[in-house]
């Protein structure tokens, strides 16, 4: 259940995916809507920090954590060493178990899902970056 000031639909706007839920207002209220272009300009782009793979590796050596938001089956095929797997669709439920003092570098195959994951984490006060180019830009994809 959503409360006053809560938001929904960010994942679809960020990753260019279809909405994954319908929301029904249970009582009278006002719904504010922000179009996709305005959302990207005002909220998404300023909140996202993109890092190159090599820089991400340096950050992980200093204590950052790779956070892979792909499906478990995708993660099992290949993933970055010591990566944590929380599928994007579980992010809101599972992020309460994450250490807020850690820097998370969110990754997926292309960067689309990871940008949604990093946005959700940033919105909740986490230090989150997105792996630029996704796993396709890593040594794993080059093999």
Language-model features and meaning:
Residues 66-68:
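Structural scaffold elements adjacent to functional motifs in cytosolic proteins
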Residues 4-7, 11-22, 26-55, 62, ...:
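Rhodanese-like catalytic fold shared by cysteine-dependent sulfurtransferases
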Residues 107-108:
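Short, surface-exposed ligand- or partner-binding patches at beta-edge/loop junctions that are enriched
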């Amino acid at each position: 259940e959503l409360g006053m000031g809560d938001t929904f639909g960010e994942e679809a706007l960020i990753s260019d995916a279809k909405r994954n839920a319908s929301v029904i207002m249970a009582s009278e209220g006002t719904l504010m809507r922000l179009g996709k272009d305005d959302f990207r300009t005002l909220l998404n782009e300023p909140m996202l920090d993109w890092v190159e793979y090599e820089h991400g590796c340096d950050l992980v050596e200093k204590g950052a954590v790779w956070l892979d938001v792909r499906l478990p089956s995708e993660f099992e095929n290949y993933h970055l060493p010591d990566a944590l797997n929380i599928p994007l669709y579980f992010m809101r439920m599972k992020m309460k178990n994450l250490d807020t003092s850690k820097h998370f570098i969110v990754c997926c195959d292309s960067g689309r899902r990871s940008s949604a994951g990093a946005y959700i984490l940033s919105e909740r006060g986490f230090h989150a970056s997105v792996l630029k180019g996704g796993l396709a830009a890593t040594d794993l994809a080059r093999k």
